[in-house]
Structures are given as C-alpha cells and as structure tokens.
A protein has these predicted regions:
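Conserved acidic segment of CheY-like receiver
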Residues: 1-17
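Alpha-helical interaction/dimerization surfaces of two-component signaling modules
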Residues: 15-20, 99
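Acidic, metal-coordinating helix/loop segments flanking the phosphotransfer/catalytic sites
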Residues: 28-54, 118
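A short, hydrophobic beta-strand element within the central beta-sheet of small alpha/beta folds
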Residues: 55, 82-94
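Active-site residues of response regulator receiver
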Residues: 57-60
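Alpha4 helix (beta4-alpha4-beta5 surface) of REC/receiver domains from two-component response regulators
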Residues: 66, 70, 91-109, 113, ...
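Short amphipathic alpha-helix used as the core "switch/output" element in two-component signaling
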Residues: 66-81
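CheY-like receiver
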Residues: 116-140
Length: 140
C-alpha cells in the first residue's frame, strides 16, 4: 500500500513495482486520515481479517491532520505492528529519520522519479522486515 498525496508519484511507484515484478497489490491513499480509517477496517478483532503486508507512507501528506511519522506511530500503537511499514519521502533529514525509527518504521526510502533501484534494493531486504530481523535502513 502507498499512502501519498502526489497522484503522479502513484503512477511512478506503480510502474516501478510492475517493472520489478513486485507481487504487491497497490492501493494508493491520498491522506493520513483516510489511511488511519482504513487501518481501523483492516485490523478488527478478527486476527484472520486480511490486511496489507507492506505500507509505504509519505512523510508530508498535504491536507492531513498528521504526518507520516505520526500515522506510523498510530498504526503501531493502535493496531500492533502486523505489517512491514516505513517512510517514503524526498527528505533526507536525519532528525526525521530518527523519529521514524523511534515510532517503529522499518525503513526509509528516498523518493525520486527513478525509484526503481531503491525498491529493488528494498525487496532484497524484504524478508528480514517481514521476520522483524532486518535492521532499519535508509535507501538512497
């Protein structure tokens, strides 16, 4: 799942995933508020309820009540960390990256028009994130 307010980036991201044969079902949401509501639907009391396996959250989502770091904090606090989750952003601010680690983000991908090499590197590490054995990593 991609949570990002830039519709053009939705297309760039989907194209890169397609080129890499990533077996991800892409659902693009435009705001952290919308994503928070969807997570409430995905994580009911039923543990067998289907939920996203991987979530890419934009750091700065225009028109949202809170940023990507706060969304990750809410998801991990309210729903547990049952999925791979991290930030995708053009920012390389070390303070923001540290905040993301603290709230439970597993990765940080630097956003660009040529996102494919970063996603390819991310996919090599994916099993470690699923098994909670992979270290936090910034993909530049």
């Amino acid at each position: 799942m991609l949570i990002d307010d830039e519709n053009l980036f939705h297309l760039v991201f989907e194209d890169a995933c397609s080129l890499l044969d990533m077996a991800l079902s892409i659902e693009a949401l435009d705001s952290s508020d919308e994503a928070n509501e969807r997570f409430k639907e995905w994580f009911p009391d039923d543990p067998n309820h289907e939920k996203p396996e991987c979530v890419f959250v934009d750091l700065n989502i225009i028109g949202s009540s809170f940023d990507g770091i706060e969304l990750i904090r809410k998801i991990n606090h309210e729903h547990g960390n049952g999925c791979v989750i991290g930030i995708i952003s053009s920012s390389e601010d070390e303070e923001e990256i540290d905040k993301a680690k603290i709230v439970g983000a597993q990765f940080w991908i630097i956003k660009s028009d040529d996102i494919e090499p970063r996603l390819e590197e991310f996919m090599k590490d994916y099993d470690g994130y699923v098994n909670k054995t992979g270290p936090f990593k910034v993909y530049r």
